[in-house]
Amino acid sequence: MPEAYSSETEKHLSASGRRLFKKCPWAYQMRYVEGISPIANISLPLVFGGLIHEALEGWYVPGRERGVPPWETFKDGFQKAAVDPENAGIFVDEQDYQVNLDLGLDMLRGYVEHYGEEPHLEVIQPELEFQVPLKYKTLDGEDRRSIMGFLDLVYRDHSNSGTLHIMEHKTAKSLSNSNQFLPLDEQASVYLVVATQTLRDRGLIGSKEVVHNMVYNYLQKTMSDTRPRNPQGLVCNKPKKEHYIATLLAAGVEMEAPEKISVKDLTKLAEDAKLTVFGDPSAVQPAPRFARKLVARNTKEMKNQVLRLRQDLMMIDATERELLPTIKNPTRDCGFCEFSQLCILDEQGSLDLDGELVRRSYTRRS
């Protein structure tokens, strides 16, 4: 049964499915209608990101107190994933395993150090599944489809009058201006559209409360900078003799002819006085490893999103039923597409979805 259908009578659509359709309807057709997916679909980034999500789910438990330290959950899950036969081959060698384990632990320890326990956040529900039916017009009538997915975290921010928020966890190689698209991001729009109804139906919020805010919670996949930081939070270079002298004198440590004292002895004096000595701030400061981006939608914007969602469903329905042609969208991203081999064969006029290549490299739902 194709993934686009949850039963013989009910169709569904996820945010990722909608995104794929708008990126390339032909790729959508392969995955969601023909039910084709690569056999080797498990990758280290996928496993790593999933474990980060699990770790944060265990940290943000319902209420205002936090749960299991996320690095503990990550370590346990990572060790289990490493011996899971389904994940065979995701690590190049033992060193690759250790590097990625250390990275995850360091990221999550740094995350808690950066944000603390955040007692002002009252968790309503972590990892909340939603399934909201939506009617839409077709080219020849009317139909309905369930919008499905998961909300990583729903909470009230008591530092902001108890405002309701959704949080979406994201891991990234770098934090940059690439998130400038977020004011128009459709994932946030869809999630905010369905969140209010889902939470009301489950009795988790009041009948007149509305969720307008979504926070993208970015964690950069880099190790922490271990260089010392001064009280202003700046990473500093190794201290020189003049730094030791200035720090000791400022603390009232008496010294005769301090300029004649060796760095070794100055270091000992600072240690005895329990003083931390910093060098000059480094010219190159580490980039932020964590960032949160707020995306808000007012009532009018959410109504517009429902309209656009219905328009997309009309196009998807017409394409699935072959009332419109299944077009392609060739771009430089095609090299990363999981269906690129099939697409090339299709262009050559030799694609056989029941052929050897599909049976060897892909699975297909019946």
Task: Tell where the protein language model's regions lie, with residue ranges.
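RecB-family 4Fe-4S metal-dependent nuclease core
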Residues: 1-366
